[in-house]
């Protein structure tokens, strides 16, 4: 990597849940930026992630966050939706090199690397994971305010026992991903 090369890193939050959006974030820092508090978002408390969100957005040279609705995920599938969002951010990034967390970007017209467990190995991928997770968690809290009986602020849309019980009791909402097994099953049984 030459001394003038700049790198952007991309990660996502929300591939596994059965409700809520997919959020993909990209971030670019000044070369040599470091911060020991930034870590894989899954290893941090909600309070630490929130504080780091502000730090990251203030310190970044550039960042972008995309929120992709459930209907798009259902139409295209989660893998394709994730890859297309990462490609969009990668194209927009004012950089020469792009790192992604375990997602190949073969059609990208920039140098790229897919890093397995990148949010554990790269500070900038970890920063992108924090931006994505905080944005998605905030979205799920708003859904929880609209539909408190579903418990979205607790399970964040993942198919927990409590979430499946809420689906059984109250039915499928627009925010549920109809292409995901538990929701498909519910639609077939109850025809919501």
Language-model region placement:
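RNase H-like, Mg2+-dependent phosphodiesterase core
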Residues: 1-192
């Amino acid at each position: 990597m030459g001394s003038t090369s700049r790198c952007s890193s991309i990660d996502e939050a929300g591939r596994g849940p059965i409700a809520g959006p997919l959020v993909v974030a990209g971030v670019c820092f000044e070369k040599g930026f470091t911060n020991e508090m930034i870590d894989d978002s899954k290893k941090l408390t909600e309070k630490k992630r929130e504080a780091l969100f502000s730090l990251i957005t203030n310190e970044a040279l550039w960042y972008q966050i995309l929120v992709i609705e459930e209907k798009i995920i259902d139409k295209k599938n989660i893998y394709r939706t994730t890859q297309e969002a990462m490609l969009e951010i990668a194209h927009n990034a004012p950089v020469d090199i792009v790192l992604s967390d375990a997602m190949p970007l073969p059609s990208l017209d920039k140098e790229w690397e897919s890093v397995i467990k990148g949010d554990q190995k790269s500070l900038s991928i970890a920063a992108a994971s924090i931006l994505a997770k905080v944005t998605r968690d905030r979205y799920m809290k708003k859904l929880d305010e609209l539909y408190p009986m579903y418990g979205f602020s607790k399970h964040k849309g993942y198919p927990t026992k409590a979430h499946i019980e809420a689906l059984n009791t109250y039915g499928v909402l627009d925010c549920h991903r109809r292409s995901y097994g538990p929701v498909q099953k519910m639609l077939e049984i109850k025809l919501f």
